[in-house]
Amino acid sequence: MTGPAIGIDLGTTYSCVAVYKDNNVEIIPNDQGNRTTPSYVAFTDTERLIGDAAKNQEARNPENTIFDAKRLIGRKFDDRTVQEDMKHWPFKVTNGPNGKPNIEVTFQGEKKTFHAEEISSMVLTKMKEIAEAFLGKSVKDVVITVPAYFNDSQRQATKDAGTIAGLNVMRIINEPTAAAIAYGLDKKGGGEKNVLIFDLGGGTFDVSILTIEDGIFEVKATAGDTHLGGEDFDNLLVEHCVRDFMRLNNGKNISSNKRALRRLRTHCERAKRVLSSSTQATIELDSLYEGIDYNTTISRARFEELCNEKFRSTLVPVEKALESSGLDKRSIHEVVLVGGSTRIPKIQTLIKNFFNGKEPCRSINPDEAVAYGAAVQAAILSGNQSEKIQELLLLDVAPLSLGLETAGGVMTVLIKRNTTIPTKKNQIFTTNEDRQEGVLIQVFEGERAMTKDNNLLGKFHLTGIAPAPRGVPQIEVTFDIDANGILNVTAMDKSTGKSEHVTITNDKGRLSQEEIDRMVEEAEKYKEEDEKRRKCVESKHKLENYCYSMKNTLSEDQVKQKLGADEVDNALNTITEALKWVETNQLAEHDEFEDKLKHVEGVCNPLVTKLYQSGGAPGAGPDMGAGFPGGAPPPSSSSGPTVEEVD
């Protein structure tokens, strides 16, 4: 049976999943009881780990523990931000086909290469499984959130990640818009409100200004930085500690030691969190590098000084969004803080001062608000009839201007940024030369006057134009943005009716359909491997459990007296051999563990039966859960307490 549609906030550092049921949004906890799950995937010699399990082992396996996939998705390898991030990542990123970044790991002793979409799809699969365990049903339909300032390539790549995870992505929605739903869902009446959502997460930053009235959420403007968040504050703290360690230890530089750096980063992140509630935090690391301990205390003031420039840079998109919306700061009724990094006191102070002392709204959980809104949108799109969400309407905008290159490399804009989507715009263009039989349509996004300064999304040729003097042919170009913010472009020669159509594809390092299909198959294969591994671990545990339980039972003196020392010693030797075998065969197959268990049971069960029949079971017998070890029969002895019939 298929369950309801879910909402997933696919974050840079943590992800969150929610569902709308019984007229309420439920944030779904994972198997550790946590309401957010680390966006981490780790590859070991034996298995693939996702979420908490992956993050918990990163210090001892830094090269094969992948995080920050969201900072790679939809980007090129030579992108400045990718090159900058690579300095901080312990895992290896290489230049792949079409300039697309590849992540290289060692998995089960073999070199493997993954795209960011595949890593993100693994995190999405984990979130899907968390929802399925909670709902007791399989889940297919999903709404996934992305930063409002994500460009076309990043949105499409996120949608591809959902497809690889076996999900039907009903809609990609913007994170601040989703958070606005969480804020405004229960606030009916009270007239029109201008709300500014300030969303500073682990890796991305968005500002959106919305007008909310009677369930209609209309985005007026959006701005942001897809490369600013808590990770950057961690990096600054790590760099400070590296310099401090050098100063204290005659210039010893730990930068090249990935394990030391990863341990330091974990403690820096922890210190950053502590500084949100305390004025100082201690970092203590035993034997950090070459046997040298590292201990330091960071004050909140020092941390704020280190990150001052980054903190202040968050106000630039706020000003930009206000300007684009045509509103001034006095017209904003409510400032809503979203994302874990808004817990930093300095960020809260900066915003409060910017808005002339207005207290930001803290009524929603900054970690969960985005998933909450995504779950509401998922319920609406899947036809949920709940009265509470019936009247809700989302009107979002395109974050960047879209246009094409005309003569001289000029950017001719068809859709201006902050235009409400979905939208469709067309314009007539013509040829630049006499008897020109084809035109190259190059599609760009960005705000600069010349295309060379903007972002090329894709290009295609329209051929077969009837030969004519320059300026005579009429070529109609149509830009169509769907509700996901993804662009389709059509060009048509009006005299011949010949047209070419493109959903912006591979020019920006997009995955082809063949690649997506291959990745879907591989994801299925990894899922099967994970299941196989789980069964192996279970059967290994069952064997060990049985062996230790029997060892305890048979080692008691009274048992040897009852059963005879030879038989008991033989059984104990069999158990010892089995446990030694487990030690040296940790990666054995499920069937091998099962066979070994049957062998040990074959030796021990007759003894257990004999023991119970003689009425001499010590204590309560081996603790094997329900029933007896290996199905040994229950005691049939006449000794012990008797049962009387009740009249």
Curated annotation (Swiss-Prot):
PROSITE patterns, per the entry: HSP70_1 (PS00297), HSP70_2 (PS00329), HSP70_3 (PS01036)
Keyword terms, alphabetized: ATP-binding, Nucleotide-binding, Stress response
Signal sequence segment: none
Biased composition (Gly residues): 616-630
Stretches the record annotates as Disordered: 615-647
One Gene Ontology term of the molecular function aspect: ATP binding
Pfam families: HSP70
Family label: Belongs to the heat shock protein 70 family.
Protein's UniProt name: Heat shock 70 kDa protein
